[in-house]
From Swiss-Prot:
Residue ranges with Polar residues bias: 429-439, 446-468
Name the UniProt record assigns to this protein: Recombinase Flp protein
KW DNA-binding (keyword) present: no
Entry keyword set: DNA integration, DNA recombination, Plasmid
Domain Tyr recombinase Flp-type span(s) in chain numbering: 135-421
Catalytic site positions: Y342 (o-(3'-phospho-dna)-tyrosine intermediate)
Disulfide bridge partners, by residue number: none
Disordered: annotated segments: 426-474
Keyword Iron belongs to the record: no
InterPro entries: DNA_brk_join_enz, Integrase-like_cat_sf, Recombinase_Flp_C, Recombinase_Flp_N
A GO MF label: DNA binding
Organism the protein comes from: Zygosaccharomyces bailii
Assigned protein family: Belongs to the 'phage' integrase family.
Amino acid sequence: MSEFSELVRILPLDQVAEIKRILSRGDPIPLQRLASLLTMVILTVNMSKKRKSSPIKLSTFTKYRRNVAKSLYYDMSSKTVFFEYHLKNTQDLQEGLEQAIAPYNFVVKVHKKPIDWQKQLSSVHERKAGHRSILSNNVGAEISKLAETKDSTWSFIERTMDLIEARTRQPTTRVAYRFLLQLTFMNCCRANDLKNADPSTFQIIADPHLGRILRAFVPETKTSIERFIYFFPCKGRCDPLLALDSYLLWVGPVPKTQTTDEETQYDYQLLQDTLLISYDRFIAKESKENIFKIPNGPKAHLGRHLMASYLGNNSLKSEATLYGNWSVERQEGVSKMADSRYMHTVKKSPPSYLFAFLSGYYKKSNQGEYVLAETLYNPLDYDKTLPITTNEKLICRRYGKNAKVIPKDALLYLYTYAQQKRKQLADPNEQNRLFSSESPAHPFLTPQSTGSSTPLTWTAPKTLSTGLMTPGEE
């Protein structure tokens, strides 16, 4: 159990009592534990003062605790606790702590982030001297360049996928990075939204343009607005369903991390917490893309920004927002205030034509309707003839412990789709039939664009780290 999970289970007055016990027993003072308790007590009071009592988030606790721990000092002779806290005015905080944790005194200084004078002067010097860096520090400008055209957008995704293939050593890391890249982009979502998806909620839903697709529910989001993550058929490499199948082969169920002081609503999450940090470091080090070289620029979270900009450039701006939740027209007959204040509790789904557009199987006609990009292939007809396996034992062997968490019907569909799709990608004749559009939505999905005429294939080692069966055993 993490320290945060332990602390949220301790009642506030019991936290105060533990602080008093620590201060009264003398040297050695466990400063790290004291810093954690003080931070939790302060955040509990601050959050409870809001009109709607807000939960204490793990990220908030970690940020404030770090500053407290670095500066914490206890003077036993005067019974005074010294530390820094991120507030403009700490007078009320000092008085509150002395009232709640009597008879001890508190001196709380304002924490200020140190300024790198040399860096600031150098930056101003370069600007005034007329030296412009080749790399733009404007994140928005770089994203606009990437999403300017269909080719520029999908070529960027292609290059990043190729980088992951070439620069990752461990298969587990490779499939996880590919999964993160594709799903945050294709769902216009924050990386944390993808991470917090509940795998036990996977379900098959019917889509008017594509047939059956999968979705998973996300109870926890940064905006506190629940949403879904969607997995739908797409042309070629960038396929959320294929990415999900590969990911579940290598990564078992991930226990849910407690991220707020409220009780967790579910037992498992989709991604490891450390994956986002690992991905950020990998991309910053290995990629030569300008967007990834901007200090503090988006990396794991780039997908939602890029997709929002891409949709905006294709007259679909209302379908996505930079906040990572799909947006729809406000409901008819509902006031603007009601829609913004409480109608978000009604679960909304993106329009089907959005999936059709992103799948690459459809294009927008001059009349504004979405029609098949090529008449030879209709994903609806293909879905109707897809031979869904009923072999649950095979599914249990293939997906291992994931089969105990994810509903069986979702895995049966996923397995069947993935196997058939890989056969198509491995068969040049079938691939040419499927991807012979004059203007494909995903220009990099032809064999020629990979720099080789070798058909795209996927193989797994004979023994997987999760003890699952290999594709050749089916």
